[in-house]
Design a protein with these regions (language model features):
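Metal-dependent nuclease catalytic cores in nucleic-acid-processing enzymes
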Residues: 191-221
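Metal-dependent nuclease catalytic cores that hydrolyze phosphodiester bonds in DNA/RNA
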Residues: 1-168
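A generic structural signal for short coil/turn motifs at secondary-structure boundaries
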Residues: 187-190, 226-228
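Catalytic phosphate/metal-binding cores of nucleic-acid and nucleotide-processing enzymes, i.e., regions
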Residues: 165, 188, 215
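Glycine-centered tight beta-turn/hairpin loop motif at sheet-sheet or coil-to-beta transitions
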Residues: 164-166, 175-177, 223
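Conserved catalytic cores of phosphodiester-cleaving nucleases, focusing on short active-site segments
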Residues: 169-186
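Secondary-structure boundary elements
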Residues: 140-144, 174-177, 204-212
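Domain-level recognition of nuclease-like catalytic cores that cleave nucleotide substrates
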Residues: 214-235
Length: 235
């Protein structure tokens, strides 16, 4: 962490939007900040590109079928199931449906299905709050050529010790040469900066041009914007 150069963009004034970080039912309480952090950029993608990449992928991998298939490791069944990926019309997308899609996407990425099974109330993000967050995203001037949930990976590097690293960049603005990591948290931590450094390491080692990239950590809830850089030899 100490190798990172972190610069705050003072043009973005701290201004907090309150969004619950948990959701509950009569069985459990689950943290949802990560889901919210996927949902807002995804809605922004839908607005500027008229597509929802994660929805398309979930349909292609038949995620709903995965949810209803018994496995030895995850034999849990959903408590209640109001939504279905295959039946959601993204042209009429509600915040509740958006959050369900993003919960499924998060499960698809990390391989853990328990939050899809356990979360039944997708009511923590109102349309009004979502709209306010989208305004903040718009202020970033992200172009419509950008890629969202952009898959990157790397292997065969000496320091990886035969490991294969895989991650999803929140947003890759190819026109502006900016890679974004978005958060929806009350306070940024070292881990958030290190996550962006992780993507920096992968991308800088894999890129085939001399293009200078900017790496930005943006906390949607607080409107905090930080540019992160590092000597490539120290990543």
């Amino acid at each position: 962490f100490n190798q990172l150069v972190i610069i705050k963009n003072e043009e973005f004034i701290f201004n907090k939007i309150d969004i619950p970080s948990t959701t509950s039912n009569d069985k459990s309480t689950e943290t949802v900040s990560e889901i919210t952090g996927i949902a807002i950029p995804s809605m922004f993608e839908l607005q500027i590109k008229n597509k929802l990449s994660i929805h398309e992928t979930l349909i292609n991998v038949m995620f709903e079928k995965i949810l209803t298939t018994e496995t030895v490791s995850q034999p849990i069944k959903p408590i209640k199931k109001k939504h279905n990926i295959n039946k959601i019309d993204i042209n009429l997308l509600t915040p509740e449906q958006l959050l369900y899609i993003c919960n499924c996407w998060n499960a698809h990425k990390n391989g853990f299905l328990f939050k899809v099974y356990q979360i039944t109330n997708y009511n923590w993000l109102t349309q009004d709050t979502l709209d306010k967050c989208i305004v903040r995203m718009t202020n970033l001037n992200i172009t419509n050529e950008s890629a969202f949930e952009y898959l990157v990976d790397i292997q065969d590097e000496k320091e990886l010790l035969n490991r294969w690293l895989i991650g999803y960049i929140d947003c890759f603005d190819k026109n502006n040469n900016i890679i974004y990591e978005f958060k929806c948290v009350n306070e940024l931590t070292k881990e958030h900066y290190l996550q962006l450094a992780f993507y920096m390491y992968i991308y800088e080692n894999k890129k085939k041009t001399d293009t200078v990239m900017s790496y930005v950590l943006f906390n949607i809830l607080t409107n905090e914007y930080y540019t992160v850089s590092c000597d490539p030899e120290k990543l």
